[in-house]
Amino acid sequence: MSHALRAFFHVDLSPSIYVDSASQGNFTLPALKHAARLAAYFAATIFIGGLLAPPLFWAGQWLTARGLFPFLANSDFERFFHRAVLFAAVALLWPLLRLSGVRSTDDLGLAPNSLWRRDLLAGFLLSTIPLLCCGALFIAFHIYSLRHVIAWTAIGKIVAASIAVSPIEEIFFRGVGLGLLLKTSYQYLAILTTSAIFSIVHFLKAPEHTSTIVTWTSGLNSIAHSFSQFADPILLGSAFITLFVLGLILADARVLTCSLWLPIGLHAGWIFAAGAFNRVAHRGILDLPWLGPNLLVGIVPLGIAGLTWLIMRNWLKYGAPGKL
């Protein structure tokens, strides 16, 4: 590991990162260390992703020009930007874990789960069924209407996204991010912090065709344009609060089970249900703050998320002995 990278991430580790709750004077220092490392990690990930996006885009164009990977020809720069950020996140993950003293999943508060299939399926059903039932009621009351033509290919992409995105995001946010902050023994602050980060990161999405001409600074331009959606404070607030609550539910599921399988199932279910419903039905106008552009934004979806949370906790308490 280079000296520069060590200098960027390095914060001196105390002999023990577990803090006696009775010692308030020594409590905040480890928490700040892990929070600072995590903040540096996310900032570096986004910045390096912005720098890598242009050469990654040019490489894709070079390959398609030679008849290789023709599907890349239909991908705009923003798609390459998101892949570059993901690549940077993976590349910086190992130094983050090493500098945080993590040598195994035990250090992140994760334990083997022999019932992982049950938790994965339960999570998927707990998030999918209430959301789709809500969507069915919207159609019945003519708030939404069925599309005349259903793009089954698009639904296939939603299925693929729910399978791929949910484990990736859960590993980063609830696995690594929450795991590092839980090492401070300050559980509630750890959950709130990672849920806020989870919500904020989802706003790092520039409008399509932001960079029609790609230059070396196009990635940084995409980062800057991500803040353009802040112009609509009601939509911003509705989306942030909903994502924050979803983050709380996912973090709670992870803490209660000491495993990522239940939150992965929940996450995959929300992606699938919201995405598939939007491909099957549509509505003409927004009705903020009650309903947003999809089933995951607004006060009503927030209530559905709360219902899922309540059902999940009761299932862990009564239907999954030993979990709660």
Model regions: which residues?
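Acidic helix/loop microenvironments that form the catalytic cleft of cell-wall polysaccharide enzymes
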Residues: V201-H202, H267-I271
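Juxtamembrane helix-entry segments on the extracytoplasmic side of multipass membrane proteins
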Residues: H148-V159, A224-S238
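N-terminal, membrane-interfacial amphipathic/helix-forming hydrophobic leader that caps
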Residues: M1-R117, T128, L132-G135, I139-Y144, ...
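Membrane-interface helix/loop boundary segments of multi-pass membrane proteins
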Residues: I168-S218, D252-S259
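Hydrophobic transmembrane alpha-helices
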Residues: A161, V165, L178, L182, ...
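Hydrophobic alpha-helical segments and helix pairs
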Residues: L137-F172, V176
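Residue-level signature of the transmembrane alpha-helical core
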Residues: L120, F124, T128, V159, ...
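Small-residue-rich segments of transmembrane alpha-helices in multi-pass membrane proteins
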Residues: D119, T184-I191, W270-A274
